[in-house]
């Protein structure tokens, strides 16, 4: 299941469709702003909105959670109780990226540092994918021709990240946010 019908949800759906992976779109809202667009773009997908019954949880093994969904959302608590694996698009990205990854996180300065490193790498002649919390969703960056990824990661994205080791990782200043 993909929880969150927004930019990240669309990115995950596009990736799943390319991989021929069936999916269910789920959203905690009754009328998410991009619902009609999602229904048109992904007519084979099932949609579960606002209310999540027992049948929904029994039908899924894994849930890709959009970074905008708070970690204490009751839906996530029920999913955890049911043993459903919760991941973010970050985990999928790191599993499928075939070029080195520079991952940047911290409380302040992530976008600036990500942009600067990305632009410097481009100037050196490399084909660079820049994104994550900044710019396009990570899965939209996956490309066989990319030589380097420079990714900004928010604390929300990192909460559901598993086995994500970049070639280089930078943790900028940390402060209560």
Residue positions per predicted region:
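N-terminal leader/targeting and accessory segments in enzymes
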Residues: 1-88, 92
